Amino acid sequence: MTARTMDAGTGDVTLFHTSQLDKLINMARENSLWYLLFGLACCGIELMQFGGPRADVMRFGAIPRASPRQADFMIVAGTLTYKMAERAKLLYDQMPEPKYVISMGSCSNCGGLFQLGYSVCKGVDKVIPVDVYVPGCPPRPEALTEGLIRLQELIRSEPWATKRRPAKGSAA
């Protein structure tokens, strides 16, 4: 993207290449992602493996945070009930912009095995916008790492100055 300005006095034209600035800022953003864990069921066990030395997500710049006010994205893993949906929405609202969500596992994506239960939300995307879906029951840490890479690609491709758009949802 190029912006053009013209000096009224001399008539000189100055070109600014803002795409290079976008690339630089997005490179910094994509390689320093801090995440908030919202593990609800079986997928919470795989989240422990995701943060362990074998998966080594810190090489991608992903660091767990205890507070939503410090997190760039949230990983929702497991069966989301209507009662917990209020808490998930509250945590999402407390995160600073730009914020992203990874839905991990069949239960988070669509309700999974428990989708016919009266208290089960039929997917996290009914409550908060989801950017990346990671399928599986439960998904392996490698699948979640692939989801993290997809999130980095999403961040790399969007202009940094835009406001948050509704999530499109990409499958990992």
From Swiss-Prot:
Q: Which Gene3D superfamilies is this protein grouped with?
A: 3.40.50.12280
Q: What is its subcellular localisation?
A: Cell inner membrane
Its primary localisation, in coarse terms, equals membrane
- Broad EC category: translocase
Q: How is the cofactor bound?
A: Binds 1 [4Fe-4S] cluster.
Q: Name one GO molecular function term.
A: 4 iron, 4 sulfur cluster binding
Transmembrane as a keyword of this entry, yes or no, is no
Keywords associated with the record? 4Fe-4S, Cell inner membrane, Cell membrane, Iron, Iron-sulfur, Membrane, Metal-binding, NAD, Quinone, Translocase, Transport, Ubiquinone
A Pfam family of this chain: Oxidored_q6
Please provide, in alphabetical order, the Gene Ontology terms of the cellular component aspect for this entry. plasma membrane; respiratory chain complex I
Catalysis: reaction(s): a quinone + NADH + 5 H(+)(in) = a quinol + NAD(+) + 4 H(+)(out)
EC number(s) reported in the record: 7.1.1.-
- Could you tell me which NCBIfam families the record lists for this protein? nuoB_fam, PRK06411.1, PRK14818.1
Tell me, what does this protein do in biology? NDH-1 shuttles electrons from NADH, via FMN and iron-sulfur (Fe-S) centers, to quinones in the respiratory chain. Couples the redox reaction to proton translocation (for every two electrons transferred, four hydrogen ions are translocated across the cytoplasmic membrane), and thus conserves the redox energy in a proton gradient.
> In which family does this protein belong, per the annotation?
Belongs to the complex I 20 kDa subunit family.
Summarize the subunit comment: NDH-1 is composed of 14 different subunits. Subunits NuoB, C, D, E, F, and G constitute the peripheral sector of the complex.
Protein name per the record: NADH-quinone oxidoreductase subunit B 1
